[in-house]
Amino acid sequence: QKTIPLNRVKAELGYSAADYFSLVYELITNRPEVNMEDLTGTELEEAETTLFKQAIAESIRSTMWVGDTSAESGANTFDGFLKTIATYSNNNKVYTYNYETDAMNTPANSVAMFDDLWKNADERLKDLKAEGQLAFFVSSDVYSAYEKHLDSMSTDGAYTDYINGRQNLLYHGIPVVDLRISSYLAKLSSSSPVPKSFCILTDRRNLVLAVNTADFPGNEIRMWYNPDEMENRQRAVFMAGCDVLDEGPVSYTHLRAHETELHL
């Protein structure tokens, strides 16, 4: 049994009075059962709490993937999955290859990538396919390249999807998941071990996030108004961490500048 290391996380947000009112008002009006002529304190509190939870959840989600404790700023409270897998890769614990900077300019290369990861995957990972929990976790450029490849197929279905869009992408029955973290990847320094373009094939259950908001001294959740700054502020202090349970059932490919070990 693997123990997930937890680190202290402090998330604090500030909103101007006008912005805060607009966000809370939008959340309230989106609820059909609310009577705007007779708002209660409970309804307002629920809207504020929802706003807070959404912001905290996004902060945890981004750190869960791009977190790097060696970074001077940004998502540095705990190491995310990408750094952990990159470390495994550097130690030759997972199947890995690198691709060139312009590889995704050719949409068909995304298919070659998926195929290579599957063919070279650990047999344990292949055996798990029938359970329906495998996924290709990809950066947005890889997702876009695969979508463009599907658009180029000369079928009626491809044309319809080109017009209407696709809700989900799959490759041989395995979901292709766009992690939607491009804005966070763009902020990483050039020396960051976290790749800006990548694809990971693994079982969803192999990636574990742990959050503890109650059992550690100093943990707190607060919402208050700061009259000096005229801001509504929200703060959460808690313990969180994530890890890859088993590096064996992981196949990994990524872009690394100036490395051309494999030409797709």
PLM feature spans:
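Assembly/oligomerization interface modules of large self-assembling protein complexes
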Residues: 1-29
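Short helix/loop capping segments that flank catalytic or ligand/cofactor-binding pockets
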Residues: 23-24, 61, 145-147
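Alpha-helical scaffold segments that mediate packing/assembly in large oligomeric complexes
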Residues: 32-120
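Extended oligomerization regions of viral-like shell subunits
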Residues: 112-212
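Membrane-proximal bilayer-interacting regions
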Residues: 215-222, 227, 231-235
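Acidic, proline/serine/threonine- and glycine-rich low-complexity intrinsically disordered segments
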Residues: 249-251
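Conserved small/polar residues in nucleotide/adenosyl-binding loops
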Residues: 253-262
